Amino acid sequence: PEIAALAQILKISGWHKVLESFGPIPYTAAGKGAIDVPFDSEETVYTEMLKDLAGAVEVLTPKAVNNVKVMSDYDLVFNGDVTKWVKYANSLMLRLAIRLRSVKPELAKQYAKQAVEHSIGVMTEAGDAAGAGPGPVIALRNPLYWIADNYNDARVGTSILAYLMGYKDPRLSAYCEPANSQCTVAVTAFDNNKYQGVPLGHTNTRSKDTDPTDSYYFYSKPKIQGNTPLYWM
């Protein structure tokens, strides 16, 4: 049952994003093998998702209390740490309850309170963050790392660089790598590193050109390594 509970949380993690992006989806009748599957209203889906999350938390909580590991070799998110799964599920429950507050305020309040007042609670610190990364037997790598570092086909945009540099945002060095030392158009930022981004709509595709004045190959990369998790929350 605990593996099914994890699967339930994973399902809701993905489907609530689809719901928020596109509106009504097939949920209550999905997976039953029918050819014609009716779409549920957003209100119905949120209500059912909250119910399913509550059920998953109920199953996992005793395992968390007893420090039982679940699928630790194959869990790419929390390495089998059920306590963190419960925190994530409760945080997801709180998020969905907030989405529902204007339509079903009492039900939203009920689930929000249930999530926050749960004995294990919600995510409260950076170590609780949910993100898929390499596991003991699965060598998952961040796809953006391959695109930016191996294919040299992604660079930081000027929009975010202008914001981070303009406001002297301390997250600059956490988000962006300095430009290559050969880049002649890089700009010195407040942290004394030089950065350069690609303008929106830029059509220069010569990523491997050797001209440092006319190729984004030398521009700032997103600061991502192969083992950087793909964060969900």
Regions found by a protein language model. Name each.
Residues 1-233:
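Structured, solvent-exposed acidic/aromatic patches
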